[in-house]
Every structure is written in C-alpha cells, then in structure tokens.
Amino acid sequence: MRKYELMYIIRTDVEQEVVQSTVEKFQAIITNGGGEISKHDLMGKRRLAYEINKFRDGHYVLVHFNAEPAVVAELDRVMKISDEVIRHLIVKDVA
C-alpha cells in the first residue's frame, strides 16, 4: 500500500448533514477498498483563493491514508461525479 494525501472542498450551500454524509461516503470508499485512514481533518468553512463555479467559500477536508492505487482511482472517479465536491486533489505522500 502507498501513502496518499487527499484534499477536497465541499460546497457551502448544502446542509451540514450532507457535508457529514459526503465525508463518510469518501471514508467508506477508502476503508472498504482495504485502505486505512491515518489522519482526517475537517478544517471547516474557509474562503477560496478565487471563485470556483460561482462559490467563494467551501468546507475544506484533509485526509492522509494508505491504500492501493485501484482504491485511489475509484475515489477519484466518485469525486469527479459528486455534485457536492467543488474541487479535489489526491497526491502521493512522501513523508
């Protein structure tokens, strides 16, 4: 398994329950694929550096996890089609 870092931004016009269910959905994809989450940080609502899809703010989430590349591909696929996610980035963690 490889180490990865995931940062994603959830829209601010959704209910808090939707934010929580979105976070749980992505955690489930990692753990159900045999991965393990080493750090999870819901950073809260923050201002974006620039406007993305007419949004100026977003709920930031940072996740450090270990998983196989197939799990990362599935996570990326689901995030691309998720309406709640404004932007996401998955990178290999070197630490």
Pin down the residues of each PLM region.
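Structured, basic alpha/beta domains of bacterial-type, RNA-associated proteins
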Residues: R2-A95
